[in-house]
Amino acid sequence: MFTEEEFEEFWKGWSEQEEANYKVVKDKSGKDSKKYLKKGYTHFDLRFWFPERKVELKTLLKNGLRFYNKNHQTEEWWPFNPFLKILLKTPRYKYQQSEGHYDLETKIRPICFASHIDGLIFGFYAYALTQKYEAYIAKEGFSECPLAYRSNLESKCNIQFSKEVFDEIKRRGNCSAIALDIKGYFDHIDHNILKEKWIKVIGEKLPPDQFKLYKALTEYSYVSKNSILRKYNVNLKKLAHSPSTLLDLVPGKMDYEKYQRLRVDRLIVTNNKFKVLKKKSTNPIDTTPRKFGIPQGSGMSALLSNIYLIDFDKDINERAKNEDFFYRRYCDDILIVCNSDKAETIQKEIIAKIKDEYYLEIQDKKVELTEFRPNSKGIIRAFNMKKQVNAGLTRTDAKNETLYYKPLQYLGFEFNGHNIYIRSSSLSRYFRKMKGRIIKTVVMAYSNNGKDNKIWKNQIFERYSHLGNRNFLTYAYNASKEFYKNSKNEAKEGMNSPSIRKQLSRHFTILVNTLSSKNNQRFLYKEYKGKAKKRKKV
C-alpha cells in the first residue's frame, strides 16, 4: 500500500482525470441525462458512474483492495472479474517480398477488457505506479528511451518521436537503421521477471494490494462473448431487450449460480501458459518451467510492458552512449541508428540479449536493416539491405539501385533519406475507410428510413476531411507543418514536409467525387428496382 500522503496525491491526480470522462447533459425533454465519454461495452457489471460513486471506490483503494462482505460478514480481498476477450481483426495489404506482389493479410490481436469497476482499479494503480516508474527511469538516466504509454514526455506524440529519429539519420548522413519487432510481446512476458522488475521500480517487496494486482494480471481469466452466445443459443437480434450485463445471457437466477454455470461449462478460461524455455547461450541446461503472459488491454498492461524492460532499456542506452549509436523503444518496436559497419553485430547481439535474458523473440520477417548512403547521383537514399544481401550484392550502381530503395518505416511515417511521407499503408487504410463510410451513408439515405431528399455528409466530412477535428487528416496535416497547435493549444514541432502535403492534396476531391459517384450508382439501382424516383442531393 502507498503511504497516506502518497495515496491522497495519487487519488487527487487520477480522480480529476477520470471525472472528465463523465458529463451531465440535458436530454430532449430538458431533463438531466448521464453521458459517458468513454466507449462502453457489456461486461459482468453495470457501468460505474464515477461522480456519484467515487467515495465508494476511494474507500476500497485506500483499504488496499480489502472490503467488508455483508453476505459473508467478513473482510475480504476484492474479487476481480474475468476479462472479456475479443479478437481485433485488421485487414492489411502487405508486400510479399519473396513472391513480388501484395497479399491481403488479417492481423489478429487479442484484447482483454476489464469489468467496469476493475478497469477503474487498474486505472488508479496504473496512474500511481507510473509516477514511480517515471521517477525510477529519470534517476537511472534513460527516460528518453521508452516512448510508448508515457506521462512525462511534454505532450509529445509520434510526430515528434519520428522526427527525432529522422533528424538523427540526417545528422549522421551515412548510417544504418535497425528496426526490430518483439513477437507477441504481452503474451510472452515472464511472470518472475515482471515481479522482479516491479519490485525494483517501487524499491520494496510488493505490498499485499500490489501483489493482489500482480496475481490478477498474471493468473487472469477471461470469457468470450461469442462463446457464451453459442453455448446458450442466444440470438441477440431476437431478444426483447439488450442485455445489461453478460450475466443476462447465462441461464440461472442468482449471479453466483451463473458464474458457477460458466465455470462448469468451461467458458471461463484461466491463463496458465507455461513451458520450458531454454536459453541458447548463457544456460542451455536450464529447464525451469516459465509462466508467462499478461492481458493486453487492461489499464495496467501498458505500464507493465515498460516496467518489464527497464534493465534492457538501461543496458542498451548505456551501450549506445559508449558505442555512439541511437536507441529508442516504442512498446514492442525497437529502433537503432548506428554506423553501418557495426549494424549487423549490434542487431545480432540485441536479438540474443532479449531472448536470453527476457525470453522474448524477435519476428524474423519484421527485422528491417535499412542503410542510408549516397546513390549514384550523390543523394542520400534508404536501401533495403536484406534484399540486397539476398541478391548477393555488396554494392549497387545507377542501373540497379532503384530496385533496392526502401524507406524506413517508423510510427506511421516513412523516410527515404531525403523526404518524409505518411506511411503508404496508413494512407490506403484511410481511403478504404472513407469509401466504406460513404457507401454506408449512401445506402442508408436510400433505405426505407431515409426520409430526407439529401445525403447527410457532415459526419463524413468530420471524420474523413480536413474540416474535422482530431481525425487522421488533421493529424497528417499537423505532421506536414513546421509548427502546429495540439489539442491542449500547445505549440509543437512538425516535420515541415512538402511530401506529406502533396500526399494529402487531393483527399477532398477524392471524397467529393466518390460521394457523387456512389450516390449516382445507388440511385440508378433503386430506380431500376422501382424504389426511387429522385436522386438524393449531395
Predicted segments with their positions:
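Short, conserved non-catalytic motifs in the polymerase core
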Residues: 83, 87-123, 141-153, 233-251, ...
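Conserved polymerase palm-domain catalytic core
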Residues: 172-331, 335-349, 402-405, 447
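Beta-rich nucleic-acid/ligand-interaction surfaces
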Residues: 144-155, 335-338, 368-378
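Helical (often loop-to-helix) elements that flank the catalytic cores of nucleotide-handling enzymes
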Residues: 338-364, 384-388
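Right-hand nucleic-acid polymerase module
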Residues: 115, 119, 123-125, 259-292, ...
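Non-catalytic, polymerase-adjacent accessory regions of viral genome-replication enzymes
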Residues: 1-101, 504-507, 511-538
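Short secondary-structure capping/junction motifs at helix and strand boundaries
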Residues: 131-142, 177, 205-210
